[in-house]
Protein backbone atom coordinates (compact mmCIF):
# COMPACT_ATOMS: atom_id res chain seq x y z
CA UNK A 1 0.00 0.00 0.00
CA UNK A 2 1.26 3.46 -0.91
CA UNK A 3 0.35 6.89 0.48
CA UNK A 4 0.62 10.50 -0.64
CA UNK A 5 0.22 13.52 1.66
CA UNK A 6 -0.43 17.03 0.33
CA UNK A 7 0.25 19.66 3.01
CA UNK A 8 -1.04 23.22 3.11
CA UNK A 9 -0.46 26.00 5.59
CA UNK A 10 2.14 26.70 8.21
CA UNK A 11 5.21 24.76 9.38
CA UNK A 12 3.15 23.26 12.20
CA UNK A 13 1.01 21.51 9.61
CA UNK A 14 4.12 20.17 7.90
CA UNK A 15 5.22 18.61 11.18
CA UNK A 16 1.80 16.99 11.54
CA UNK A 17 2.17 15.55 8.04
CA UNK A 18 5.59 14.16 8.94
CA UNK A 19 4.09 12.46 11.99
CA UNK A 20 1.20 11.05 9.95
CA UNK A 21 3.68 9.74 7.40
CA UNK A 22 5.67 8.09 10.17
CA UNK A 23 2.53 6.41 11.48
CA UNK A 24 1.55 5.14 8.04
CA UNK A 25 5.03 3.69 7.54
CA UNK A 26 4.70 1.72 10.79
CA UNK A 27 1.40 0.36 9.44
CA UNK A 28 3.05 -0.97 6.31
CA UNK A 29 2.53 1.93 3.90
CA UNK A 30 5.21 3.25 1.57
CA UNK A 31 5.35 6.76 0.14
CA UNK A 32 4.17 7.00 -3.47
CA UNK A 33 5.92 8.93 -6.24
CA UNK A 34 2.78 10.99 -6.81
CA UNK A 35 -0.87 11.29 -5.84
CA UNK A 36 -1.80 9.39 -9.00
CA UNK A 37 0.14 6.33 -7.83
CA UNK A 38 -1.10 6.27 -4.23
CA UNK A 39 -3.67 3.96 -2.65
CA UNK A 40 -4.27 6.52 0.11
CA UNK A 41 -4.26 10.26 -0.64
CA UNK A 42 -4.32 12.69 2.29
CA UNK A 43 -4.94 16.44 2.18
CA UNK A 44 -3.67 18.14 5.34
CA UNK A 45 -5.60 21.39 5.21
CA UNK A 46 -5.28 24.92 6.59
CA UNK A 47 -8.18 27.01 7.91
CA UNK A 48 -6.41 30.06 9.32
CA UNK A 49 -7.96 32.63 6.98
CA UNK A 50 -10.43 32.60 4.08
CA UNK A 51 -7.71 32.48 1.42
CA UNK A 52 -6.18 29.41 3.08
CA UNK A 53 -9.56 27.68 3.19
CA UNK A 54 -10.16 28.38 -0.49
CA UNK A 55 -6.75 26.95 -1.36
CA UNK A 56 -7.47 23.87 0.75
CA UNK A 57 -10.78 23.20 -1.02
CA UNK A 58 -9.17 23.69 -4.43
CA UNK A 59 -6.42 21.25 -3.48
CA UNK A 60 -8.89 18.61 -2.28
CA UNK A 61 -10.87 18.84 -5.52
CA UNK A 62 -7.67 18.65 -7.56
CA UNK A 63 -6.54 15.56 -5.64
CA UNK A 64 -9.95 13.97 -6.20
CA UNK A 65 -9.37 14.30 -9.95
CA UNK A 66 -5.75 13.16 -9.84
CA UNK A 67 -6.08 10.06 -7.67
CA UNK A 68 -6.63 6.65 -9.20
CA UNK A 69 -10.16 5.24 -9.25
CA UNK A 70 -9.53 2.79 -6.41
CA UNK A 71 -7.65 5.15 -4.10
CA UNK A 72 -9.16 6.63 -0.95
CA UNK A 73 -9.10 10.37 -0.30
CA UNK A 74 -8.84 11.69 3.27
CA UNK A 75 -9.13 15.30 4.42
CA UNK A 76 -7.46 16.11 7.73
CA UNK A 77 -5.93 19.15 9.42
CA UNK A 78 -7.47 22.41 10.54
CA UNK A 79 -10.38 22.49 8.08
CA UNK A 80 -11.36 18.95 9.01
CA UNK A 81 -11.30 19.79 12.70
CA UNK A 82 -13.12 23.09 12.34
CA UNK A 83 -15.75 22.18 9.74
CA UNK A 84 -15.87 18.38 9.96
CA UNK A 85 -19.51 17.49 9.29
CA UNK A 86 -20.10 20.50 7.05
CA UNK A 87 -17.01 19.67 5.02
CA UNK A 88 -17.98 16.03 4.68
CA UNK A 89 -21.42 16.98 3.39
CA UNK A 90 -20.02 19.50 0.92
CA UNK A 91 -17.36 17.19 -0.55
CA UNK A 92 -18.84 13.87 -1.68
CA UNK A 93 -15.52 13.20 -3.47
CA UNK A 94 -13.91 12.60 -0.07
CA UNK A 95 -13.93 9.17 1.57
CA UNK A 96 -13.12 10.37 5.08
CA UNK A 97 -12.88 13.62 7.00
CA UNK A 98 -10.59 13.03 9.98
CA UNK A 99 -9.68 15.43 12.77
CA UNK A 100 -6.39 15.70 14.62
CA UNK A 101 -5.23 12.34 15.85
CA UNK A 102 -7.92 10.35 14.07
CA UNK A 103 -6.65 7.05 12.71
CA UNK A 104 -7.62 6.47 9.10
CA UNK A 105 -5.53 3.44 8.22
CA UNK A 106 -8.77 1.45 8.06
CA UNK A 107 -11.11 3.73 6.19
CA UNK A 108 -14.81 3.86 6.80
CA UNK A 109 -17.04 4.42 3.81
CA UNK A 110 -18.66 7.50 5.33
CA UNK A 111 -17.16 10.55 7.05
CA UNK A 112 -16.87 10.55 10.83
CA UNK A 113 -18.45 13.05 13.20
CA UNK A 114 -15.71 15.24 14.61
CA UNK A 115 -17.18 17.89 16.84
CA UNK A 116 -17.91 15.52 19.72
CA UNK A 117 -14.22 14.81 20.28
CA UNK A 118 -12.15 17.50 21.99
CA UNK A 119 -8.86 15.58 22.23
CA UNK A 120 -7.09 13.33 19.74
CA UNK A 121 -7.62 9.59 19.79
CA UNK A 122 -3.83 9.21 19.86
CA UNK A 123 -0.87 11.48 20.61
CA UNK A 124 -0.03 13.12 17.30
CA UNK A 125 2.84 15.11 18.80
CA UNK A 126 4.84 12.04 19.76
CA UNK A 127 4.32 9.87 16.71
CA UNK A 128 7.48 8.73 14.91
CA UNK A 129 8.49 10.63 11.79
CA UNK A 130 10.28 9.48 8.64
CA UNK A 131 13.84 10.51 7.86
CA UNK A 132 14.05 14.08 6.61
CA UNK A 133 15.58 14.91 3.23
CA UNK A 134 16.95 18.24 4.48
CA UNK A 135 19.68 19.05 7.03
CA UNK A 136 17.15 21.01 9.06
CA UNK A 137 13.82 20.03 10.61
CA UNK A 138 10.86 21.61 12.34
CA UNK A 139 10.15 20.28 15.83
CA UNK A 140 6.74 21.10 17.25
CA UNK A 141 7.08 21.36 21.02
CA UNK A 142 3.45 22.13 21.88
CA UNK A 143 -0.04 21.99 20.43
CA UNK A 144 -2.86 24.49 20.92
CA UNK A 145 -2.81 27.93 22.53
CA UNK A 146 -3.98 29.47 25.81
CA UNK A 147 -4.21 33.00 24.42
CA UNK A 148 -7.40 34.37 22.92
CA UNK A 149 -6.35 36.99 20.40
CA UNK A 150 -9.30 38.80 18.87
CA UNK A 151 -8.55 37.75 15.28
CA UNK A 152 -7.57 34.11 15.82
CA UNK A 153 -9.83 31.05 15.76
CA UNK A 154 -7.04 28.50 16.24
CA UNK A 155 -7.75 27.76 19.94
CA UNK A 156 -11.33 26.84 19.01
CA UNK A 157 -10.15 23.84 17.01
CA UNK A 158 -6.56 23.24 18.16
CA UNK A 159 -7.53 23.55 21.82
CA UNK A 160 -5.63 24.88 24.82
CA UNK A 161 -1.86 24.58 24.99
CA UNK A 162 -0.50 21.07 25.53
CA UNK A 163 3.28 21.02 25.86
CA UNK A 164 5.44 18.01 25.16
CA UNK A 165 7.87 16.97 27.86
CA UNK A 166 11.58 17.73 27.63
CA UNK A 167 12.28 14.00 27.34
CA UNK A 168 9.90 13.60 24.39
CA UNK A 169 11.42 16.56 22.58
CA UNK A 170 14.97 15.39 23.27
CA UNK A 171 14.18 11.92 21.97
CA UNK A 172 12.94 13.37 18.69
CA UNK A 173 15.84 15.83 18.44
CA UNK A 174 18.42 13.10 18.96
CA UNK A 175 16.78 10.88 16.36
CA UNK A 176 16.85 13.75 13.88
CA UNK A 177 20.50 14.45 14.68
CA UNK A 178 21.33 10.79 14.11
CA UNK A 179 19.69 11.16 10.69
CA UNK A 180 21.94 14.07 9.74
CA UNK A 181 19.89 17.08 10.85
CA UNK A 182 22.10 20.03 11.81
CA UNK A 183 19.43 22.63 12.58
CA UNK A 184 16.25 22.38 14.64
CA UNK A 185 13.50 24.96 14.14
CA UNK A 186 11.29 24.93 17.23
CA UNK A 187 7.64 25.81 16.59
CA UNK A 188 4.37 26.12 18.52
CA UNK A 189 1.45 28.51 18.51
CA UNK A 190 3.02 30.36 21.46
CA UNK A 191 6.58 29.09 21.79
CA UNK A 192 7.64 31.25 24.74
CA UNK A 193 4.88 29.74 26.90
CA UNK A 194 6.09 26.18 26.36
CA UNK A 195 5.97 24.10 29.53
CA UNK A 196 3.80 26.39 31.62
CA UNK A 197 0.71 24.22 31.16
CA UNK A 198 2.66 21.17 32.38
CA UNK A 199 3.89 23.09 35.40
CA UNK A 200 0.37 24.31 36.21
CA UNK A 201 -0.99 20.78 35.93
CA UNK A 202 1.72 19.49 38.24
CA UNK A 203 0.80 22.02 40.91
CA UNK A 204 -2.93 21.80 40.36
CA UNK A 205 -3.12 25.49 39.49
CA UNK A 206 -5.63 26.92 37.05
CA UNK A 207 -3.78 30.05 35.93
CA UNK A 208 -0.23 31.29 35.61
CA UNK A 209 0.77 34.32 33.59
CA UNK A 210 4.33 34.54 32.32
CA UNK A 211 4.28 38.33 32.51
CA UNK A 212 3.88 38.12 36.30
CA UNK A 213 7.25 36.48 36.77
CA UNK A 214 8.60 33.05 37.50
CA UNK A 215 11.01 30.84 35.63
CA UNK A 216 10.59 30.18 31.93
CA UNK A 217 10.86 26.50 30.92
CA UNK A 218 11.83 27.36 27.31
CA UNK A 219 15.14 28.76 28.54
CA UNK A 220 16.38 25.43 29.85
CA UNK A 221 14.96 23.53 26.88
CA UNK A 222 16.86 25.78 24.47
CA UNK A 223 20.07 25.31 26.44
CA UNK A 224 19.72 21.54 26.48
CA UNK A 225 18.92 21.30 22.77
CA UNK A 226 21.81 23.61 21.90
CA UNK A 227 24.14 21.06 23.47
CA UNK A 228 22.72 18.34 21.21
CA UNK A 229 22.70 20.10 17.85
CA UNK A 230 24.60 23.03 16.33
CA UNK A 231 21.69 25.28 15.42
CA UNK A 232 18.48 25.73 17.39
CA UNK A 233 16.13 28.36 15.96
CA UNK A 234 13.00 29.61 17.75
CA UNK A 235 9.86 30.73 15.86
CA UNK A 236 6.56 32.28 16.99
CA UNK A 237 7.68 34.18 20.10
CA UNK A 238 4.89 36.19 21.74
CA UNK A 239 6.53 39.53 22.64
CA UNK A 240 5.68 39.46 26.35
CA UNK A 241 7.42 36.10 26.53
CA UNK A 242 10.70 37.57 25.29
CA UNK A 243 12.20 37.88 28.77
CA UNK A 244 15.73 39.00 29.54
CA UNK A 245 16.62 35.41 30.37
CA UNK A 246 15.30 34.13 27.07
CA UNK A 247 17.11 36.86 25.14
CA UNK A 248 20.39 35.88 26.83
CA UNK A 249 19.76 32.21 26.06
CA UNK A 250 19.00 32.83 22.38
CA UNK A 251 22.13 34.95 22.00
CA UNK A 252 24.24 32.33 23.79
CA UNK A 253 22.89 29.60 21.49
CA UNK A 254 24.70 31.12 18.51
CA UNK A 255 21.48 31.69 16.54
CA UNK A 256 20.57 35.34 17.28
CA UNK A 257 17.33 35.16 15.29
CA UNK A 258 14.20 36.66 16.85
CA UNK A 259 10.85 35.81 15.28
CA UNK A 260 8.44 38.05 17.17
CA UNK A 261 4.68 37.86 16.75
CA UNK A 262 3.94 41.61 16.97
CA UNK A 263 0.83 42.00 14.71
CA UNK A 264 0.70 45.81 15.01
CA UNK A 265 2.49 48.78 16.56
CA UNK A 266 -0.49 50.88 17.65
CA UNK A 267 -1.20 50.29 21.34
CA UNK A 268 -4.88 50.97 20.72
CA UNK A 269 -5.05 48.35 17.98
CA UNK A 270 -3.09 45.82 20.00
CA UNK A 271 -5.56 46.15 22.87
CA UNK A 272 -8.43 45.76 20.41
CA UNK A 273 -6.72 42.54 19.29
CA UNK A 274 -6.39 41.43 22.95
CA UNK A 275 -2.63 41.60 22.69
CA UNK A 276 0.23 42.94 24.79
CA UNK A 277 2.66 45.74 24.09
CA UNK A 278 3.07 48.83 21.97
CA UNK A 279 5.41 50.02 19.26
CA UNK A 280 7.45 51.90 21.85
CA UNK A 281 7.91 48.81 24.03
CA UNK A 282 8.77 46.66 21.03
CA UNK A 283 11.44 49.14 19.95
CA UNK A 284 12.90 49.16 23.46
CA UNK A 285 13.20 45.37 23.42
CA UNK A 286 14.77 45.37 19.95
CA UNK A 287 17.28 48.03 21.07
CA UNK A 288 18.30 45.93 24.08
CA UNK A 289 18.97 42.95 21.82
CA UNK A 290 20.92 44.96 19.24
CA UNK A 291 23.04 46.51 22.00
CA UNK A 292 24.03 43.01 23.08
CA UNK A 293 24.35 41.62 19.53
CA UNK A 294 24.45 44.15 16.67
CA UNK A 295 24.09 41.36 14.10
CA UNK A 296 20.86 39.98 15.59
CA UNK A 297 18.17 39.22 13.02
CA UNK A 298 14.50 40.14 13.45
CA UNK A 299 11.38 38.83 11.74
CA UNK A 300 7.74 39.62 12.47
CA UNK A 301 4.24 39.60 11.00
CA UNK A 302 1.53 42.25 10.99
CA UNK A 303 -2.21 42.49 10.32
CA UNK A 304 -3.59 45.36 8.25
CA UNK A 305 -7.23 46.40 8.34
CA UNK A 306 -8.28 45.05 11.73
CA UNK A 307 -11.71 46.47 12.68
CA UNK A 308 -11.41 50.04 13.88
CA UNK A 309 -7.96 50.64 12.38
CA UNK A 310 -7.55 54.31 11.45
CA UNK A 311 -5.09 56.33 9.39
CA UNK A 312 -3.37 57.29 12.65
CA UNK A 313 -2.88 53.60 13.47
CA UNK A 314 -1.45 53.06 9.99
CA UNK A 315 0.92 55.98 10.49
CA UNK A 316 2.10 54.48 13.79
CA UNK A 317 2.78 51.18 12.08
CA UNK A 318 4.74 52.84 9.26
CA UNK A 319 6.80 54.80 11.77
CA UNK A 320 7.49 51.62 13.69
CA UNK A 321 8.57 49.71 10.56
CA UNK A 322 10.99 52.51 9.69
CA UNK A 323 12.39 52.71 13.23
CA UNK A 324 12.62 48.95 13.84
CA UNK A 325 14.56 48.14 10.66
CA UNK A 326 13.43 44.51 10.75
CA UNK A 327 15.26 42.08 8.50
CA UNK A 328 12.12 40.21 7.48
CA UNK A 329 8.39 40.81 7.83
CA UNK A 330 5.14 39.37 6.58
CA UNK A 331 1.96 41.41 6.13
CA UNK A 332 -1.61 40.14 5.94
CA UNK A 333 -4.98 41.79 5.59
CA UNK A 334 -7.51 41.03 8.31
CA UNK A 335 -9.76 38.04 7.70
CA UNK A 336 -12.98 37.93 9.70
CA UNK A 337 -13.20 34.49 11.31
CA UNK A 338 -16.30 32.85 12.73
CA UNK A 339 -16.15 32.47 16.50
CA UNK A 340 -13.61 35.24 17.11
CA UNK A 341 -14.07 38.54 18.92
CA UNK A 342 -13.24 40.52 15.79
CA UNK A 343 -15.96 38.83 13.76
CA UNK A 344 -18.64 40.85 15.52
CA UNK A 345 -16.87 44.18 15.86
CA UNK A 346 -18.13 47.39 14.30
CA UNK A 347 -16.04 49.63 12.03
CA UNK A 348 -14.86 46.89 9.68
CA UNK A 349 -12.19 48.26 7.32
CA UNK A 350 -13.09 47.95 3.61
CA UNK A 351 -11.04 45.28 1.86
CA UNK A 352 -9.62 47.69 -0.72
CA UNK A 353 -8.44 50.08 1.98
CA UNK A 354 -6.81 47.22 3.90
CA UNK A 355 -5.00 46.15 0.72
CA UNK A 356 -3.85 49.71 0.08
CA UNK A 357 -2.40 49.86 3.61
CA UNK A 358 -0.74 46.49 3.12
CA UNK A 359 0.90 47.65 -0.10
CA UNK A 360 2.17 50.77 1.64
CA UNK A 361 3.87 48.94 4.52
CA UNK A 362 5.12 46.15 2.25
CA UNK A 363 6.84 48.65 -0.04
CA UNK A 364 8.57 50.24 2.94
CA UNK A 365 9.66 46.89 4.39
CA UNK A 366 10.88 45.58 1.03
CA UNK A 367 13.24 48.54 0.78
CA UNK A 368 14.48 47.96 4.34
CA UNK A 369 15.03 44.25 3.72
CA UNK A 370 16.95 44.95 0.51
CA UNK A 371 19.11 47.53 2.25
CA UNK A 372 19.89 45.20 5.15
CA UNK A 373 20.81 42.45 2.70
CA UNK A 374 23.09 44.88 0.82
CA UNK A 375 24.86 45.60 4.11
CA UNK A 376 25.90 41.94 4.33
CA UNK A 377 28.07 42.18 1.22
CA UNK A 378 31.70 41.81 2.28
CA UNK A 379 30.90 40.00 5.53
CA UNK A 380 31.97 36.50 6.42
CA UNK A 381 29.20 34.01 7.22
CA UNK A 382 28.90 30.37 8.18
CA UNK A 383 26.40 28.53 5.99
CA UNK A 384 24.50 25.29 6.34
CA UNK A 385 24.11 23.84 2.84
CA UNK A 386 20.44 22.91 2.32
CA UNK A 387 20.64 21.76 -1.30
CA UNK A 388 23.21 21.93 -4.12
CA UNK A 389 24.26 25.57 -4.47
CA UNK A 390 21.92 26.82 -1.72
CA UNK A 391 22.87 27.61 1.87
CA UNK A 392 21.70 29.64 4.85
CA UNK A 393 23.43 31.55 7.62
CA UNK A 394 21.82 32.06 11.02
CA UNK A 395 20.11 35.12 9.49
CA UNK A 396 17.86 33.05 7.21
CA UNK A 397 15.13 30.74 8.42
CA UNK A 398 14.41 27.84 6.06
CA UNK A 399 11.50 28.23 3.63
CA UNK A 400 10.44 31.74 4.68
CA UNK A 401 13.54 33.95 4.31
CA UNK A 402 16.08 34.50 1.55
CA UNK A 403 18.93 32.15 0.65
CA UNK A 404 22.68 32.34 0.02
CA UNK A 405 23.88 30.98 -3.33
CA UNK A 406 27.23 29.16 -3.29
CA UNK A 407 29.37 26.79 -5.33
CA UNK A 408 27.07 23.79 -6.08
CA UNK A 409 29.80 21.24 -5.44
CA UNK A 410 29.66 21.77 -1.65
CA UNK A 411 28.07 18.74 0.03
CA UNK A 412 24.52 19.11 1.31
CA UNK A 413 24.37 19.07 5.10
CA UNK A 414 27.84 20.54 5.57
CA UNK A 415 28.76 23.82 7.25
CA UNK A 416 31.07 26.09 5.24
CA UNK A 417 32.58 29.54 5.75
CA UNK A 418 31.92 32.04 2.98
CA UNK A 419 32.28 35.69 2.07
CA UNK A 420 29.18 37.44 0.76
CA UNK A 421 30.02 39.05 -2.59
CA UNK A 422 26.66 40.26 -3.94
CA UNK A 423 23.01 40.75 -3.06
CA UNK A 424 20.04 40.07 -5.31
CA UNK A 425 16.94 41.34 -3.54
CA UNK A 426 16.35 38.96 -0.65
CA UNK A 427 19.03 36.50 -1.78
CA UNK A 428 22.80 36.69 -1.48
CA UNK A 429 25.74 35.33 -3.46
CA UNK A 430 28.86 34.01 -1.73
CA UNK A 431 32.26 32.46 -2.38
CA UNK A 432 34.04 29.91 -0.20
CA UNK A 433 36.68 31.25 2.15
Predicted segments with their positions:
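Conserved SAM/AdoMet-binding glycine-rich loop
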Residues: 73-77, 82, 178-312
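Extended hydrophobic-aromatic, low-complexity segments
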Residues: 258, 270-271, 294-297, 312-314, ...
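Terminal RNA-binding accessory module
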Residues: 333, 344-433
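Proteins enriched for Cys/Gly/acidic motifs involved in redox and nucleic-acid/cofactor modification
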Residues: 1-194, 217, 279-291, 315, ...
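Glycine-enriched alpha-helix->loop->beta-strand junction motifs that scaffold or abut catalytic
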Residues: 93, 250-257, 323-327
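Short beta-alpha junctions and helix-cap segments that line functional grooves
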Residues: 246-247, 317, 406
Amino acid sequence: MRYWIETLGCPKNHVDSDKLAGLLVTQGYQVAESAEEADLVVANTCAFIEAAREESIETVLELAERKSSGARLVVTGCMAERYGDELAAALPEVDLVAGFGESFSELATTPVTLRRRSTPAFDLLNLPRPATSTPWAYVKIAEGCDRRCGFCAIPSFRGDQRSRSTEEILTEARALAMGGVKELVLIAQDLASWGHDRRRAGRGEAVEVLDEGGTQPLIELTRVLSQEIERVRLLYLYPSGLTSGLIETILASGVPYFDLSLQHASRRMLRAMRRWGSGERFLERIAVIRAAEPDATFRSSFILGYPGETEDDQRELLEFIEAAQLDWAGFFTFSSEEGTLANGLDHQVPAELALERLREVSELQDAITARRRDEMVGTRQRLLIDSPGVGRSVRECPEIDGIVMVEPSVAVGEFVDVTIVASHGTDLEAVLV
